[in-house]
Amino acid sequence: MKHFNLKNIIAAAALAATALGANAQPKGPAWLGNALFYQIYPSSYMDTDGNGIGDLPGITQKLDYIKSLGVNALWLNPIFESGWFDRGYDVIDFYKVDPRFGTNSDLVALVNEAHKRGIKVCLDLVAGHTSDKCAWFKESMQKDTNLRYSDYYIWTDNISENDKKEIEERRKGPNPASDTRGRYVEANAPRAKYYEKNFFECQPALNYGFAHPD
């Protein structure tokens, strides 16, 4: 029997995300062409520990039912450790299952049980940004720019007057943390005054366009 560890699963998630992209070429795993997906938002699926939040063991318990629907692939919304400001899309650690859903071992068990039933499992990989609580971001904000994660984010001391205006407008709003307007966040970190975000202020954009790719 073939077993899978968490790194294998994350690699598969990245592959699926690439293959399903809007501009993807007809490449990738052969099974994807005939896949019939069943999407699960884990928080609202089956809860096995009575805390009111769905979890991975709950999904595993329902695999026979899912199989009976005629699907052959699962798509799980984000399950990685998260600050949970944006329903799991503010990832703290891409290598750890959020405790609300279970453990890394629970994820491996789910994948193995799904594969026994001919069901593939794809994870929603949040590839554009992380949480500002992510260890990568905390290292990147340091003054030393030669650290491993220094260039994982986009920092600057100079932004346009319009960008400054958008920051001020967010600050004056009723809930600045939930305001998605604008491009930059005022950080006043050792590294620089501002960082680029994707959506909310707590979601610093990952840097795909500069030096030192990992």
Regions found by a protein language model. Give the residues of each.
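Bacterial N-terminal signal peptides that target proteins for export
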Residues: 1-10
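Hydrophobic h-region of N-terminal signal peptides that target proteins for export
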Residues: 13-22
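Acidic/aromatic-lined carbohydrate-recognition and catalytic surfaces
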Residues: 25-212
